[in-house]
Amino acid sequence: MRLRWNSNRRKFLGGLGVLASSMAMPWKLFGSSPENKSEATPSGFGASGNPYEELGVTTVINAEGTMTMLGGSLIRPEVEAVMALAARHFVSIPALEEAAGKRVAQMLKLPEGYGALVTSGAACAIQSGLAGILTGDNETLIQQLPDLTGMKSEVIIQKSHRNPFDHQLRGTGAKLVVIETRDQLRAAVSERTAMMHFSNFANEAGQIKVDEWVKLAKEYKIPCFNDAAADTPPVSHLWDYANMGYDLVAFSGGKAMRGPQCAGLLIGRQDLVHYALLNNSPYEDTLGRGQKVGKEEILGMIKALELYLNEDHDALAQEWQNRLDLISRAVTRVPGVSTSFFTPDIANHVPHMRIMWDSRVTLTPQQVSQMLRNSTPSIVMGGGEGKPGLAMNSFMLQPGEDQIIADQLSRILREHKA
């Protein structure tokens, strides 16, 4: 395949030579040379240590979880350090993506023939993955998207799996064929079917579960995608679905793994992962050009994954529960207030707590939520998802923030007794 956007072959191959030589002197790629060892000290903007405050933007205590609207998660210091090293050098992005994908596949012990791609997030992984299935490595088709003339054009999805993120599927130009039953799925399969899409968080809502969905896809020889963006923990999900036979799986890098917010992983068959890259930045005239992932995010994602795989996940879960217990003990001292605990089966599979109260407290959950947001420091806590009271989790809280929430929430509830 001849790629017009790779037409300057001499420069590209020269860049690979630089990359190879730099691996013999790793400080050139990842380390510090004597002249750049010192950390830059901000002057002007950022000199206060709180650039958000300088802009008049309020930082918040996040009791809602890894919400993109709140910035996802906080990048680990070790990840920041690797990203800072990455920022000091130029590198061939396609070569870096290939090397990073191999490293990720090794770390996750993916099945033979599987690879990985660092994307700008799980949503990008969804769109790029489908785009690659539609076009393969055909340059004309890649540049043609979202015009699907001459390509397969339909994606089968369960009705209960429809969600705002299937916009990424529709963005390729594909038509969603919505089904509910096994018989409807079999009837929907045609020569136009490009992919079968599964939203992992909706596993319990649909009639066809995660394991049967991929078996049906294999039966019809249709590529099968699983959107598992928020589905770590448990950590095993990072390889479970590939081992189950899914051709492509998407994960967010900026949630529980605490990698760069603008990073994600597309895991799957090596050919499809390669086609996804061809439909993405750094290549021009592609659907995914605007979903650029930088060298800093690529290397930061590898470091975040390394740290995540080596964590004591049981100890972390206990720490999260301890934080909720502290808050529960404080708020239940207020007459009429009670708490209960739950852990979602999939998606944000971490300890959660629901906080409820009876008529002895005169506020609605919405009023309490707004008061917490308006407090100092500002606290963001979610609603009860259509259920009474407030719901929260603690896995994005920083040390000491559980006590702040306990104090603020107890005060608000106590001050508004009937």
Language-model segments: residues:
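N-terminal export signals
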Residues: 2-5, 9-33
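Flexible, glycine/charged-enriched surface loops at secondary-structure junctions
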Residues: 93-98, 113-116, 288-291, 311-320, ...
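Conserved C-terminal alpha-helix-loop-beta "cap" of PLP-dependent enzymes
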Residues: 51, 331-412
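Conserved PLP-enzyme active-site core in the AAT-like
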Residues: 13-20, 37-61, 65-70, 74, ...
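A general structural detector for well-ordered alpha-helical segments in enzyme core domains, enriched
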Residues: 209-213, 327, 368
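Metallocofactor- and cofactor-centric catalytic cores in central/energy metabolism, strongly enriched
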Residues: 69, 74, 80-81, 88-91, ...
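Structural signature of PLP-dependent enzymes
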Residues: 305-329
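Generic N-terminal amphipathic, Lys/Arg-enriched alpha-helix
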Residues: 59-69, 80-87, 352
